[in-house]
């Protein structure tokens, strides 16, 4: 079951091009779901990133219930733990939904199969996923609208954009680029493509993503390919929680620059994969780590 859940999560962060936009006083997601662009008083949220954004901009009072995650907690941990949970990221207890009488339900694409059932019950539903950093910025703005915290949201969006532009400016001065990948699993060795949040993070950090040259939305990196590309670093996320898993996945790993220089590490999936404002701070941390690799 754990492998199935993480595989679904991987699809969520790679295959999809989910976006959310405001147009003609309506909020529209990539699936054609539309809601009025206004403040909602009673919101059920299954997207961890949106929950984190709501707390950051002071819109948490609009939350009546959430869907909790199974693998990692949602920030701020102590406050989110006190919220009522009526399901998880992929499924909601419909009887509980009726009980809380929401005027808006915000879900991720992992709940797509259940959206129609919820809509038939007469509820406003929107899919909130972002698959890029720009998408996260847009999500911050939309979250501000639905929670009545538009000013606070735009302030947060600007702060995140400043951080992103600072990173881009610093990277533009570099004369060379590191090569690497963020891995989802080691059996087989699957990496995040460019069309994903982790892939977009690498791009903005000025890293050459070795998975970009492998066809498909879920690039499988063969031992021969890894040896040929000779990455400067390899990072793990999702189902990976130890560098040892990566090192022992193939006998070619120790032969790469990443293996020889011990540049194999694990990233916090709740930060690097989640469509939350916190990813921009995590990029700063990752940038410093990559700078140390460059200066070795």
What are these regions (language model features)?
Residues 74-75, 197-218, 266:
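His/Asp/Glu-enriched short active-site or ligand-binding loop at hydrolase and phosphoryl-transfer sites
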Residues 129-142, 181-197:
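Extracytoplasmic ligand-binding site segments that recognize negatively charged/polar headgroups
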Residues 93-107, 123, 222-236:
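Proline-aspartate-enriched helix->loop->beta-strand connector
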